[in-house]
């Protein structure tokens, strides 16, 4: 059984430094934080060759160790992917300030005015997979939202993560934000000890399996924002446009199969299965996708048999489970039983069927006639995401800047005391004022 160690003196010192830097960061203005992100982007561009070389080292070592192809795809950070990450930082810098937004403005009595204002969380701890571009996304989201961050990436990406973090800190050193606002955890012991840093860390965001999320929730007093498996479904309804549904299915599986928002199971209504699968099966085969079907779908060109395990497997690869269902009820029941509450989609031209599906599926994202690959903070216009939350409580779905802030009530008075309201000397007006 894995035990959670006490944090070392060195880790406590680093966490304390992040906490102090986060306090100062929370006092910076919008322009200072935007400038800090531009400086981070500049430093990443300057150190691009070093970062890409470090990534090649990680790739070579991981290939020799037999890392799965899906994880190798996530691990890769070439020059083009790095440029995209840098562009994302610059775009994030240009987004509206998430801090200082007045969400409520109410007069309680003459001269007694209540406000609710958005403020940073403080310090976030993020444990994520072997995806080094996630370091860039998470760090930039944290700084833009006024939060310090302690980051622990997959060990497969350790060289890349260290090179990226060095560049990010170099950029912060040229800005009004202290480099201590970010720190990188590099060992398993440190990531476990992070769970005991309540009082220094305000939120933990694990990006990984259900088992990882459950372990963290069971072993920390720090609030946890759960991001678990991405077992996403596309349901092809009886009234689907076949050509459109095939395009959506192909994109949802093949555009980036290692992503958590790629579909892992395709559900097809029995009445449209012959026509749909006649087009879809050759298209998937041409794209290099291995299909595993139930008994009914195997009557339409799928040779490999699916097992019960396939319905609950996140392949992150060019493998797709296919099931023919007799009704939408059966599709909804399958999703309830096997889904991970991430993202589900329906392809249909029937408005009534569409509204029923959109209302009945309890996932963070429910889509009509479009690819599940849109479940992404950048594509939602959030700039980037720190993760995708599959829990019911907010924030839910892709967590961007707005998911990394909380709020504070500010009350301004002029000698007001509660006793005057208790004895009837004064009375509340409760008048909403302009935001």
UniProtKB/Swiss-Prot annotation:
GO terms for cellular component: cytoplasm. Its main location: cytoplasm. The lineage of its organism: Bacteria, Bacillati, Cyanobacteriota, Cyanophyceae, Synechococcales. Keywords: Amino-acid biosynthesis, Cytoplasm, NADP, Oxidoreductase, Proline biosynthesis. One of its GO terms (biological process) is L-proline biosynthetic process. This is Gamma-glutamyl phosphate reductase. Belongs to the gamma-glutamyl phosphate reductase family. InterPro entries: Ald_DH/histidinol_DH, Ald_DH_C, Ald_DH_N, Aldehyde_DH_dom, G-glutamylP_reductase_CS, Glu-5-SA_DH, GPR_dom. GO terms for molecular function: glutamate-5-semialdehyde dehydrogenase activity; NADP binding. The keyword Amino-acid biosynthesis applies. Pfam families: Aldedh (PF00171). Pathway: Amino-acid biosynthesis; L-proline biosynthesis; L-glutamate 5-semialdehyde from L-glutamate: step 2/2. HAMAP family: ProA. Transmembrane segments: none annotated. It comes from Parasynechococcus marenigrum (strain WH8102). Its EC number is 1.2.1.41. The keyword NADP applies. It is found in: Cytoplasm. It is an enzyme of class 1 (oxidoreductase). It catalyses: L-glutamate 5-semialdehyde + phosphate + NADP(+) = L-glutamyl 5-phosphate + NADPH + H(+). Catalyzes the NADPH-dependent reduction of L-glutamate 5-phosphate into L-glutamate 5-semialdehyde and phosphate. The product spontaneously undergoes cyclization to form 1-pyrroline-5-carboxylate.
């Amino acid at each position: 059984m894995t035990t959670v160690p006490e944090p070392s003196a060195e880790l406590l010192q680093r966490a304390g430094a992040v906490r102090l830097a986060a306090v100062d960061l929370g006092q910076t203005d919008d322009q200072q934080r935007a400038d800090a992100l531009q400086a981070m982007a500049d430093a990443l561009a300057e150190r691009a060759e070093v970062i890409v070389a470090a990534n090649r080292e990680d790739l070579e070592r991981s290939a020799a160790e037999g890392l799965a192809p899906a994880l190798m795809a996530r691990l890769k950070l070439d020059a083009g992917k790095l440029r995209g990450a840098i562009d994302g930082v610059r775009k994030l810098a240009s987004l509206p300030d998430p801090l200082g937004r007045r969400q409520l403005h109410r007069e309680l009595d003459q001269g007694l005015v209540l406000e609710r204002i958005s403020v940073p969380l403080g310090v976030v701890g993020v444990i994520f997979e072997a995806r080094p571009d996630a370091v860039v996304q998470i760090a930039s989201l944290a700084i833009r939202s006024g939060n310090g961050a302690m980051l622990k990436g997959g060990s497969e990406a350790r060289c890349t993560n260290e090179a990226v973090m060095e560049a990010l800190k170099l950029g912060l050193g040229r800005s009004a934000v202290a480099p201590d606002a970010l720190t990188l955890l590099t060992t398993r012991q440190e990531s476990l000890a992070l769970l005991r840093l309540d009082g220094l860390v305000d939120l933990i965001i694990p990006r990984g399996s259900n088992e990882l999320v459950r372990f963290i929730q069971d072993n920390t007093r720090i609030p946890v924002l759960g991001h678990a498996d991405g077992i996403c479904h596309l349901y092809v309804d009886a009234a689907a446009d076949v050509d459109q549904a095939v395009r959506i299915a192909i994109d949802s599986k093949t555009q980036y199969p290692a992503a958590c928002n790629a579909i892992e199971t395709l559900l097809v209504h029995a009445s449209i299965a012959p026509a749909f699968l006649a087009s879809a099966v050759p298209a998937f085969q041409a794209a290099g996708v291995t299909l595993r079907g139930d008994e009914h779908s195997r009557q339409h060109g799928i040779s490999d048999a699916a097992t019960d395990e396939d319905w609950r497997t996140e392949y992150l690869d060019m493998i797709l489970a296919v099931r023919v269902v007799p009704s939408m009820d059966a599709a909804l029941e399958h999703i309830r039983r096997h889904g991970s509450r991430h993202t589900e989609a329906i392809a249909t031209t029937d408005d009534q069927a569409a509204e029923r599906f959109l209302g009945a599926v309890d996932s963070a994202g429910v889509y009509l006639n479009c690819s599940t690959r849109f479940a992404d903070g950048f594509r939602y216009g959030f700039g980037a995401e720190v993760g995708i939350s599959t829990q019911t409580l907010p924030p839910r779905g892709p967590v961007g800047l707005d998911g990394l802030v909380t709020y504070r009530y500010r009350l301004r008075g002029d000698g007001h005391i509660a006793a005057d309201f208790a004895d009837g000397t004064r009375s509340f007006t409760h008048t909403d004022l302009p935001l």
